[in-house]
UniProtKB/Swiss-Prot annotation:
Changing residue 508 to V: Loss of histidine kinase activity. Pfam families: HATPase_c, HisKA, Response_reg. One of its GO terms (biological process) is response to water deprivation. Residues 1045-1196 form the Response regulatory domain. Disruption phenotype: Insensitivity to ABA, but hypersensitivity to drought and high salinity stresses. Loss of seed viability over time dur to altered desiccation. The keyword Repeat does not apply. This is Histidine kinase 1. It is found in: Cell membrane. Mostly expressed in roots, and, to a lower extent, in stems, leaves and flowers. Residues 1-10 have a biased composition (Polar residues).
Length: 1207
């Protein structure tokens, strides 16, 4: 339809001038309307209300003005086409000019930079080669001087001709050794103070080696000649016609003489260094020539001092040819082009990159040639340009561009090498066309190509614009898309609102009954008539109820996790107890599935950490639950160890005994680790590593990464077999990442899955961490009789690590055999004879135990070792009872162990009972009880105590599930909820009073049983009363609300009863009403009777209209209550309206009754709403008892509240 309207509008355009003007006016009007429509859409797209108005406007324009808008769209598209074409032409033209300009300029600059680098490299290489030659020559000269000084000092002041000859022969030998080892040397000379000369020379023309020396007969033994320059110089050496010079050919390898010495004239001598070359007694360099070579020679001279280091006794000269430098220059020029040459400071050529001569023949023999006289034209012209430009004061470094030599332009660069008395200048001459020739040639071609390409791009662009904009107008498509987007956004916002409202309603509907259940359990726990077993059962029910409440909170946090707005709490908690309580909870399910649950925490784990305990427990609960789901046999191990954050290195690896955690995600984790080390530099942070290892079906390695995604499972059939939504591991990963860690599936040996993760938590500064007791000094011997091999192995390993002798037994027969060998009289002296089937390791362990003096035996027996299917277990108990006076028994009970078995154990005096599984904390408790028993010296058992009442053993069962409520169940529930009371009932094993009571009961004899149980000191009785009460308050605070009058408005009968009992126990006077209307009415009648709501109540509108005046007048006179606890959701009149009515009645008076909100809503917006209507505080259900007391005291008795805080 839209396309038809568009075509009809085009076909019906009038051709007359009037029609043309009308058409233009219509187009202008429509175009203006479109502009007004598009502008607010772009600026106010984020406002939902304006989007609704815009949507209505769009729909109206769509259906009423379709043809007008289509016509306007056609012409607007035509105008846009022309504008785009013009703009494209301008942009392409500018792009062409700018491209040509910047390409030319930047290319030229880049090439010049490269040219400079090339020239610099060409200069540096001869410099390096020259330095190599100089260093080699200098090192050889120094070595020869040191050798000469050593020999001369050895023959200091020879007195006879024989000693002098012997010294010269030694000098010859050491000089030959050095000369033969340095193949690059041309000659080595030694000129002695008495005029004697020794020299070695290589003739490159004939490849011969010669030894040159003067006649020794013409020189005295001691050099009496002058030591200054005037009496001892090079000229005297070469011009001494009276001296007889000899030259003897040598073997180039062995140095042996080849033939007899031959006399030579002085003119044939090589360069011999004299004292004139070392006038100041230091090394010097000079250039010389030889008739044997066509290139200059570089000679170094050093003096040789006598033993006193005061006078010169000889001069050593080392001569090296500069041929290698010239060869390097020629190699460089062949690759890069141009010319390179070296000159002395006076301008004499030393080496060039050409094959031209470097010496010129004169009547006095070969002489050095100046660069300005070179036969090579480029070198000659360059040297003349440098001399003309800079004269005799040439700078050390010269960089010249575009130097015209003849018809070409060159780059000329020079460097300066300063030697002792021999400065050297290097020059590089490169033709400019070698670098910039191609650029200059192609500059014009490049411009033509760019212009042609720009024109082609312009025409192609215009064609593409015409093709792409042809057809239905783009604005029409955008309008339809806009309408769809606005509608989709409206539906998404409505869906989000529905979701939020649903979560809020579910929070109220579920938290209200859960609050009632938990409150009733608290009342039941506070009953002193509960036995220990009943108390444990009720406590476990409360934990499960709190776990359900935590699941509800997880539902509320789901949206926060998805949006990344989840806020973790930062509070101290006992990490070990959290994990122990978690393992205890899951162990019941694992025992039913014949799966062993093991907790293996290292000793260096911190006792207290700071973080969100509820989230941490949620992580491991999901992981362990997932392992239980897929594990049908074997074990599930939760391991934990720690390391300091400053010990993290590049791979974040841990030592081998820490099970080698992987380096998480390589580069990403290295960056993450660097960030953590910087941000936590001054914080007391710890890296806690954990592993959840199971023996289940395992996960395909290809699925190791995908299992952490939302709604992903390793196998599609998992949902049908085991259930689940695939969200558990996703939430775990999000929580782990939120805590600064990572989680990953790693490879393991054997069946099952190994999940490894690390968390970064802080530890308190003032708390002593990991104070481990020393058990090695008490002579303890522990026998572990457990069916589970994994837990038995880990426990025995920990015991042996702490110096406790440990013996393991897996069944009844092995246990009885070990007991007989260790505890029966005479068995320990038989050295475990071979008739018993005992393994060698066990035999060695038993032998070590025999050597322990005064051992204390502790036998930990799994109840499953006994045959409970028949009555044989009683006989087994009777058998073990024979050894009760020699060992202490601790029993591992299952959750379903019958009361008959427990009663029989108590009757036999076995009072140390621990619920499975057994882990380090429980083992420590058992050992501490035994050690305390030994310290007191009480060695009698409790065999006959079974005749007494069962209540005498209620406190003797060692079980954290009975005493420890400081677990995750009482941890913080949500980020918007206050901290729940964690001190309902402290752990008995951490109480010194109960520890004393435990040892007293376990070590009392039969005669003192009744006395010890009846004569309890007041401190113990008071502690036990507080232990078994659901309100863990001090005696002085049990009536902390004494005298406070509280009005309770609650519509749920159970919650009303719970709150009333709770407040009355703390001394408050409570008046309960059923809705907000009765709460407002009760302010007129203090003694109102709370009745259950009936159908006879009038509607809210009728009573409000009739009684509002009376209520407001009465509130102005008096205040019958000190505080009001107001439920927010009630019938007839809710808490919000009731609060508004009360606050309106208080206007004009000095009264202000504190109102505390009670609500099951857990959203942060609910608290703001309560405070906005006039309430003074906000409490969520279930009610935190301590928080409620502190809130009431702060509003009614500020002074008492401050006193309690300071206390």
């Amino acid at each position: 339809m839209r396309g038809d309207s568009f075509s009809m509008s085009i076909e019906n355009l009038p051709d007359s001038p009037m029609g043309s003007r009308k058409k233009k006016m219509q187009i202008r009007k429509v175009f203006d309307k479109m502009t007004e429509w598009v502008t607010p859409w772009r600026s106010n797209l984020e406002s939902p209300r304006e989007m609704m108005i815009l949507r209505g406007d769009v729909e109206q324009d769509e259906f009423q003005y379709a043809s007008s808008h289509c016509l306007s769209s056609y012409y607007s598209v035509f105008v846009v086409r022309l504008a785009i074409m013009v703009m494209l032409a301008i942009l392409i033209g500018l792009l062409t000019v700018l491209t040509w300009h910047f390409t030319r300029i930047y290319t030229k600059q880049s090439l010049q930079t490269l040219a400079y680098g090339l020239r610099y490299e060409l200069l540096q290489r001869p410099v390096l080669r020259m330095w190599s030659v100089l260093n080699t020559t200098s090192e050889l000269t120094t070595a020869q001087v040191k050798l000469s000084e050593y020999v001369i000092k050895k023959y200091d002041k020879p007195t006879t001709q024989e000693e002098l000859v012997e010294m010269y022969q030694a000098m010859k030998d050491v000089t030959w050794a050095l000369f033969a080892s340095a193949k690059a040397l041309n000659a080595i000379t030694i000129n002695y103070r008495n005029g004697f000369v020794q020299a070695f020379h290589r003739d490159p023309a004939s490849s011969s080696t010669f030894y040159i020396f003067s006649d020794l007969k013409n020189y005295s033994i001691s050099g009496t000649g002058p030591e200054d320059v005037s009496g001892w110089n090079n000229k005297s050496i070469h011009g001494n016609m009276s001296a007889i010079w000899y030259q003897q050919q040598l073997d180039p390898v062995t140095g042996e003489n080849l033939g007899k010495p031959l006399k030579i004239p002085p003119d044939d001598l090589i360069n011999i260094a004299g004292i004139s070359q070392v006038p100041d007694g230091e090394a010097s360099w000079h250039v010389t020539v030889s008739k044997y070579m066509d290139s200059p020679l570089l000679s170094a001279a050093l003096p040789v001092f006598d033993a006193s280091n005061k006078s010169i006794v000889a001069v050593v000269g080392v001569t090296t040819a500069l041929y290698s430098v010239g060869q390097l220059m020629r190699d460089l020029v062949e690759v890069h082009g141009g010319h390179i040459y070296l000159t002395s400071q006076e301008g004499y050529l030393l080496a060039t990159s050409t094959d031209g001569p470097l010496l010129k023949n004169t009547s006095n023999g070969p002489q050095l040639m100046k660069a300005t006289d070179s036969e090579e034209w480029v070198i000659k012209s360059g040297a003349q340009w440098l001399e003309k430009t800079y004269g005799s004061k040439r700078p050390h470094v010269v960089h010249a561009e575009n130097v015209k030599l003849g018809d070409q332009r060159y780059y000329i660069d020079s460097f300066y090498l300063n030697l002792k008395r021999l400065p050297i200048v290097g020059v590089v001459i490169i033709p400019r066309k070698f670098i910039m020739g191609k650029v200059d040639e192609r500059a014009f071609k490049t411009l033509i190509i760019l212009i042609s390409a720009s024109v082609c791009i312009f025409f192609i662009g215009c064609v593409c614009i015409l093709i792409l904009t042809n057809g239905v107008s783009k604005e029409m498509k955008l309008r339809a898309e806009l309408i769809r987007q606005l509608d989709a956004r409206r539906r998404a916002e409505a869906s989000s609102n529905y979701k939020s409202q649903f979560l809020a309603n579910m929070s109220h509907e579920l938290r209200t009954p859960m609050a009632a259940v938990i409150g009733l359990l608290d009342i039941l726990i506070s009953d002193d008539c509960l036995s220990n077993e009943q108390y444990a059962t009720v406590t476990q029910i409360r934990k499960c109820s709190t776990a359900l409440l935590r699941l509800l909170n997880n539902i509320l946090d789901l949206s926060k996790v998805e949006s990344g707005k989840l806020v973790l709490e930062e509070a101290e908690f006992d990490l070990g107890r959290e994990l122990e309580g978690l393992v205890d909870m899951f162990s019941v399910q694992c025992i039913n599935h014949n799966v062993e649950t093991v907790l293996d925490l290292s000793d260096d784990m911190p006792a207290l950490v700071r973080g969100d305990s509820a989230r941490l427990v949620q992580i491991f609960a999901n992981l362990i639950s997932n392992s239980i789901k897929f594990t049908t046999t074997g074990h599930i191990i939760l391991r934990g160890w720690c390391e300091n954050i400053n010990s993290l290195h590049d791979e974040m690896s841990v030592s081998v005994d820490r099970r080698k955690p992987w380096a998480p995600m390589k580069t990403k984790q290295v960056q993450h680790r660097n960030h953590l080390q910087k941000s936590c530099k001054n914080a007391n942070k710890m890296v806690l590593w954990f592993e959840v290892d199971d023996t289940g079906c395992g996960i395909d390695p290809s699925k190791w990464d995908s299992v952490f995604e939302s709604f992903e499972q390793a196998d599609p059939s998992t949902t049908r077999t085991h259930g689940g939504t695939g969200l558990g591991l996703c939430i775990v990963r999000n929580l782990v990442n939120k805590m600064g860690g990572e989680i990953k599936v790693v490879q393991k040996n054997g069946l099952g899955t190994l999940m490894r993760l690390y968390l970064i938590l802080s530890t308190p500064d003032t708390v002593d961490q990991n104070i481990q007791p020393d058990f090695s000094k008490y002579g303890l011997v522990v026998m572990l009789s457990m069916y589970g091999s994994t837990a038995r192995m880990i426990t025995s390993k920990w015991l042996r690590k702490h110096g406790i002798a440990t013996v393991e037994a897996s069944d009844w027969n092995e246990l009885t055999q070990i007991i007989r060998d260790l505890l029966e009289t005479g068995s320990r002296d038989n050295s475990f004879d071979s008739q018993h089937n005992i393994s060698d390791p066990l035999r060695a362990e038993l032998s070590n135990i025999v050597e322990i003096k005064n051992p204390v035996f502790v036998i930990v027996v799994d109840i499953g070792v006994l045959d409970l299917t028949t009555n044989i277990w009683k006989e087994q108990l009777n058998y073990l009872d024979r050894f009760s006076n020699k060992a202490k028994f601790a029993w591992l009970l299952k959750h379903d162990t019958s009361n008959t078995v427990k009663t029989e154990l108590r009757r036999k005096g076995h009072v140390m009972m621990v619920n499975k599984p057994l882990y380090k904390a429980k083992m420590i408790q058992i050992l501490e009880a035994v050690i305390k028993n030994r310290k007191r010296g009480l060695c009698n058992d409790l065999r006959n105590r079974g005749n007494g009442s069962d209540e005498s053993h209620d406190c003797l069962e060692i079980d954290p599930t009975q005493f420890d409520t400081c677990s995750s169940d009482d941890s913080s529930e949500t980020s918007g909820e206050k901290q729940v009371d964690k001190s309902v009932k402290p752990s008995t094993l951490h109480s010194p009073v109960l520890k004393n009571y435990l040892i007293d009961a376990t070590t009392s004899n039969d005669d003192s049983t009744s006395a010890s149980m009846t004569q309890k000191n007041p401190e113990e009785e008071d502690w036990k009363d507080r232990l078994y009460s659901g309100i863990a308050l001090d005696g002085k605070n049990q009536k902390s609300l004494e005298g406070i009058r509280i009005l309770l408005a609650e519509d749920t009968p159970v919650l009303q009863r719970v709150a009333t009992i709770m407040l009355e126990k703390m001394g408050a006077t409570v008046t309960a009403v059923w809705d907000g209307q009765q709460a407002v009415d009760s302010l007129n009648y203090k003694s109102i009777n709370a009745q259950a709501p009936t159908e006879e109540h009038k509607s809210f509108e009728e009573e409000t209209a009739n009684k509002v005046t009376t209520r407001e007048t009465s509130l102005r006179n008096s205040s019958p209550y000190d505080l009001i606890l107001m439920d927010c959701q009630m019938p007839k009149m809710d808490g919000y309206e009731a609060t508004k009515a009360i606050r309106r009645a208080e206007i004009g008076t000095e009264l202000h009754i504190p109102i505390v909100a009670l609500t099951a809503h857990a959203m942060s917006s609910d608290e703001a709403k309560c405070l906005e209507v006039g309430m003074d505080a906000y409490l969520t259900k279930p009610i935190d008892r301590k928080l409620m007391v502190s809130t009431i005291l702060s509003l009614t008795k500020p002074s008492a509240f401050q006193t309690s805080l300071s206390a």
